[in-house]
Amino acid sequence: MERRSESPCLRDSPDRRSGSPDVKGPPPVKVARLEQNGSPMGARGRPNGAVAKAVGGLMIPVFCVVEQLDGSLEYDNREEHAEFVLVRKDVLFSQLVETALLALGYSHSSAAQAQGIIKLGRWNPLPLSYVTDAPDATVADMLQDVYHVVTLKIQLQSCSKLEDLPAEQWNHATVRNALKELLKEMNQSTLAKECPLSQSMISSIVNSTYYANVSATKCQEFGRWYKKYKKIKVERVERENLSDYCVLGQRPMHLPNMNQLASLGKTNEQSPHSQIHHSTPIRNQVPALQPIMSPGLLSPQLSPQLVRQQIAMAHLINQQIAVSRLLAHQHPQAINQQFLNHPPIPRAVKPEPTNSSVEVSPDIYQQVRDELKRASVSQAVFARVAFNRTQGLLSEILRKEEDPRTASQSLLVNLRAMQNFLNLPEVERDRIYQDERERSMNPNVSMVSSASSSPSSSRTPQAKTSTPTTDLPIKVDGANVNITAAIYDEIQQEMKRAKVSQALFAKVAANKSQGWLCELLRWKENPSPENRTLWENLCTIRRFLNLPQHERDVIYEEESRHHHSERMQHVVQLPPEPVQVLHRQQSQPTKESSPPREEAPPPPPPTEDSCAKKPRSRTKISLEALGILQSFIHDVGLYPDQEAIHTLSAQLDLPKHTIIKFFQNQRYHVKHHGKLKEHLGSAVDVAEYKDEELLTESEENDSEEGSEEMYKVEAEEENADKSKAAPAETDQR
C-alpha cells in the first residue's frame, strides 16, 4: 500500500491530476535547479498542474514521482516529491531515470543507484527493463503517444556513496557514473590498466555509444574492484597525511581554517552553477570537525587514530570543495563530459609538456569567427594555417558548433589545433597569415620548400592544372531542381557502384574535399533553399548524378589518372631525392622498344641505404609531429580510433600506415618494457622498425582486438593503393 501525503489524484493518470485544483506546482526548493537544467516554469506546467499540450519540439514532459527507500519500517516507502520534467526526445529510454533525476537536481551517485518503474494510466506498474529490450530505443519511440498518461516512479536507494553499494546491485548506469567520476582523476588509458574494463569499452560506455548493456557479471566485477580502489585510495591518503602532519604542533599550510572551510562549503552549496550536489553525510561532517580542529594547534589529547581519521576526512572535504569550485566556473551544461583530454598542436620544434594541458574553450567557434574578422582572412587560409585542413571542413565545423565536451576524437584534434593557434600572439598569427598568402601566390616556391618545412606548413597549396571537372560549375541554379533527403542514399549507392573513394567523388561531383563529403553524409540535413550553401552544393551533386552512367565512369577514370600523374610530377620536382627518382626510372622493365636513354651506362647496384630512401620520404616523423603524437598518447591513449588516425594523417601530412606503425611500436614497448619508447631529440623513421618490434595480433589482449583489426585494414588499404598506383606511374614514365 502506498503511503502519500498528497491528494489521491496523484496516484492516477496525469489527466486526472491536470483537472484537480488541489495539486500544486513543484516545490519551490527545486525550481532553481530545474530552470538551471533547462526546464523553464512556463514549459514545465501551469499553475493548476496541467501540462503543455505542444510536444512537437525536442522535449517530452514526463511526470516523475521520486520515492526514498530507507531502512526503517516507518519510512519504508516515503515519497520525496512529484513534478514534471522535460526530457529530450533523443535520450535513450534506458537512461530516462538518470536523466530525470539529474534534471531534478539529484547527484550522479543517487541517479546511478535509482530504479525506475513506469505506470501507464491505471495499469499495473512495470520496471523500465521489462518495457523494451531494444538498447537503442529512445524516449520518443516509447512515450511519444502516451506521455500524457505515463507516470515514472523513481526509487532511490539509501546508499550515499557508490562504494557503499553492494556488488550485486551494480548495473550499467552505476558503472557509467563511476567511470565518469574516475575519469576526472585519470585518463582512459590509465584507468583501463587498473580496472577490469578495456579502454574502448570505457570510452563507449561513458559516451553512451555502447548500446548493449554491460553484463551483470562484468558490472559486479567492476563494483568489487571499485570498492577496493576507493579503500586503497583512502588508506593512501591517510598515510600521506600522517607523514605530512605527524608533528602535532605544525599546522598544514594547504589545509584552510575550518571556519573558512565551512564558509566555502556554504558558498559552494549556494552556487547556482554547480552541477555536483554532495551527499548529506559529507556536508554534515564539516561543522562536526570544528570543535576537534581549532585554528591553532591540534589537540594533543586526541588519540592518533582519531587524528588520522579527522585529517583524512578534512582532506577529502577539501578535495570535494576544490572540485565543486572548479566545476562552478564551467558551463552549466558541462555535467560529466570532462573526461577526455586530447592533444594540442604545438608550434615549437621541441614539444612542450605544458601544451598538453591546453583545454578547448566552449566559445572556440566564436573565437574563430572573431579572428576571421580581425585578420580579414578567408576560411581557406585560416583552415590551412590553423589545423591544415580545407575550407569546406572548417565551414562545416563552424556551422555545426558541436560541444567540445561531447565531440569525437577527430573533431577534438582539430579544435585543439585551432585553440592552440589562437593562443599564439597576434603578431605571430599575422605573420603566419602573410607567409601563407605568399605561398599561395608562389606555389612553385612553396612546393620546393615543402620538403624541409614543418608538418603544419608542409601541405602547402600546389600548382593546380586543369582537371576534368573544370567544366562543372561550382554553383548552379537550383530553382528547377528537385532535391530531397534521398540524395544522400544516392551518393552512397553511386560510390559503391563505381567503387570510388569519398575523396574522388567529392572532387568530381562538387569540387570539395573528402572531409566535407564525410560531414555531409554524417549529418544528412534536410535540403532546403533557405540553406543556400548546402542547396547549391547538392544541386551541383545532383547535376553530376544526372549524367549518364558511362560519362560518370569516364570522369572517374580521368580524375584518377590525373591524380596519379600529378602525384608523379610532384615526386619528380622534389629536390631531396633526384638520385632515387633516376634510379627508379632506369630500373623499370621495358616491354616495347628501348628508348635512347637506356644507352647510358647502367647505374651501380642498389645498396641497402638507397633502397631505404623511398619509404623514408613518407615514413619519417619529424620532431614536431613526434611531439603531437606523444601528446596524443599521453592524453588519449595508445588506441586511437579510425577517425582520429585519419585526422592525424591529414594534419601531420603522413600516411596512415606510418601513424599505425608508430602506435604499434609504442604498444610493443609498453607491453614488453613497461614504458613508452623514448626519442631523445631526434626524428623517427618507422621504416627502421623491425617486425618483432611491432605488437602482433597474437600478443594483443581481448580488449585490443578491435583496434588491431582496424590497423590491419588500414595497412591493407594503403598497400592496395600503392599497388594500384604502380602501373599508372609506369605508364607515365
UniProtKB/Swiss-Prot annotation:
Expressed in cortical neurons that extend axons across the corpus callosum. Also expressed in branchial arches and in cells of the osteoblast lineage, but not in chondrocytes and osteoclasts. Residues 459-470 have a biased composition (Polar residues). The keyword S-adenosyl-L-methionine does not apply. Residues 709-733 have a biased composition (Basic and acidic residues). Keywords: Chromatin regulator, Chromosomal rearrangement, Developmental protein, DNA-binding, Homeobox, Isopeptide bond, Nucleus, Phosphoprotein, Repeat, Repressor, Transcription, Transcription regulation, Ubl conjugation. SMART domains: CUT, HOX. Residues 161-234 form the CUTL domain. It comes from the Eukaryota. InterPro entries: CUT_dom, CUTL, HD, Homeodomain-like_sf, Lambda_DNA-bd_dom_sf, SATB1/SATB2, SATB_CUTL_sf, SATB_ULD_sf. Residues 57-158 form the CMP domain. There is a cross-link at residues 233, 350 (Glycyl lysine isopeptide (Lys-Gly) (interchain with G-Cter in SUMO)). Residues 694-708 have a biased composition (Acidic residues). It is found in: Nucleus matrix. The modification Phosphothreonine is found at residue 467. Sumoylated by PIAS1. Sumoylation promotes nuclear localization, but represses transcription factor activity. GO terms for molecular function: chromatin binding; DNA-binding transcription activator activity, RNA polymerase II-specific; DNA-binding transcription repressor activity, RNA polymerase II-specific; RNA polymerase II cis-regulatory region sequence-specific DNA binding; RNA polymerase II transcription regulatory region sequence-specific DNA binding; sequence-specific DNA binding. The modification Phosphoserine is found at residues 20, 39, 454, 594. Residues 1-47, 435-473, 580-617, 691-733 are annotated as: Disordered. GO terms for biological process: cartilage development; chromatin remodeling; embryonic pattern specification; embryonic skeletal system morphogenesis; negative regulation of transcription by RNA polymerase II; neuron migration; osteoblast development; positive regulation of transcription by RNA polymerase II. Residues 441-458 have a biased composition (Low complexity). There is a cross-link at residues 24, 30, 161, 350, 475, 724 (Glycyl lysine isopeptide (Lys-Gly) (interchain with G-Cter in SUMO2)). Belongs to the CUT homeobox family. Interacts with PIAS1. Interacts with ATF4 and RUNX2; resulting in enhanced DNA binding and transactivation by these transcription factors. This is DNA-binding protein SATB2.
